[in-house]
Design a protein with these regions (language model features):
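Active-site cofactor/cluster-binding pocket
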Residues: 1-188
Length: 188
């Protein structure tokens, strides 16, 4: 079983990202779950969401405490949360940032990828200049960095879960797939 933990802030789309990813994995023949964990349920508050998948039926229903991979939708989360808590060695950390992966020496035990999802979201009219919605963008980068899911399945998941601006969300995901910067081992 593979488990992914998303760290974001309310309004960025972490919960929908986990659902889109689960849908994409299901489309590729895997069993998948997606679920959130909320603290203070307000816009801008830290949020975690989770996706787990396997080739066989999943009976586990707990939160993800030892993720295989971590996705950080808001770089400022790194200042308030230990995103590597429980992260398995050699796991991927994907960070929404304009910085290169080498800017994160504290993550030397892990494989690191970065993408400027805020910029790509803004360029595609997703959210606002001060509150870009980066969930679909980050999933394009996740597909490329990890190799765990294909971009076509992500795009189909976007069609299913995103109520508006489907073309803009798909375009942003495709661009993120092309622009993600990967450091460490090649995709699994």
């Amino acid at each position: 079983m593979i488990e992914i933990r998303f760290h974001g802030r309310g309004g960025q789309g972490a919960v929908i990202a986990s659902k889109i990813l689960a849908s994409a994995l299901f489309r590729e023949g895997k069993h998948a779950q997606a679920f959130p964990a909320f603290g203070g349920e307000r816009r801008g508050a830290p949020v975690m969401a989770f996706t787990r998948f396997d080739k066989k039926t999943i009976t586990r229903r707990s939160m993800v405490y030892e993720p295989d991979h971590v996705v950080v939708l808001d770089e400022s989360i790194l200042e308030v949360a230990d995103v590597t808590s429980g992260l398995k060695e050699k796991g991927w950390i994907l960070v929404n940032t304009p910085k290169p992966p080498s800017a994160y020496p504290q993550f030397h035990k892990f494989r690191v990828a970065t993408v400027d999802a805020n910029r790509l979201a803004q360029e595609n009219g997703l959210g606002t200049a001060t509150a870009p919605v980066v969930n679909t963008v980050i999933l394009g980068a996740f597909a490329k960095a990890t190799g765990l899911v294909g971009l076509p399945a992500i795009l189909e998941g976007i069609e299913e879960y995103v109520p508006g601006k489907k073309e803009a969300n798909s375009a942003a995901a495709k661009t993120a797939f092309e622009q993600v910067i990967i450091f460490g081992s090649s995709p699994i």
